[in-house]
Amino acid sequence: GGGYSTDAGFLADVGLRERNLLGTGIDARTNLTLAQKRSQVDISVTDPQFLERNLVAGADVFLVQRNLQSTSGYNERRAGFTLRAGYEINEHLRQSWSYTLVDRDLYDVDSGASRFIQEQSGSTLLSQISTTVTYDRRDSRIEPRSGYVARAGSDLAGLGGDVYYVRLRGDGQYYIPFERLLGDPDYVLVFAVGGGWMLPYNGSDTRIVDRFFLGGESL
């Protein structure tokens, strides 16, 4: 496919998916995105019934390159992997856990970039464990038309690597079908809110690649 994104420019996207890899029930995906200011390769595998239990487990491998010269005066490369697992607590409540190890490189820093960015030029290794609790009262997870969902999560970086911080984050969406308001079933009104808090530790400073941003890279 193709399209246009305000943060990446014109883009092309190619993906392959096998929902039952070699008859194992594993969902395998690979995706390649090429854009004016971004290129990305993702490979992921997911077992929806890991160890024949009510447990979803999977792994992702990724490589991302971003050209931020026009907005921030630097380029960024990320390469790493994520191991993840999730389970249902009850009909509406679920929890997920993940571990991520990623090498980040901030390079080609413009001489006119801020001192804050220039001081962060180079590579860092992020080792992070995360958890998210989701309370979901939507009528559908795939194509919701009514209801709401709320998420609360935390990230701990510093289990190895050279980046140290604690982050708390939360977000939610509320869906109102236009059929209820105007009698038109083809549209849905969505209200969304999100926020986060970050605290570095072990003498570390917050880095621009770890901060919260609004827009295309929202969290």
Stretches found by the model and what they are:
Residues 1-151:
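Gram-negative/organellar outer-membrane beta-barrel architecture
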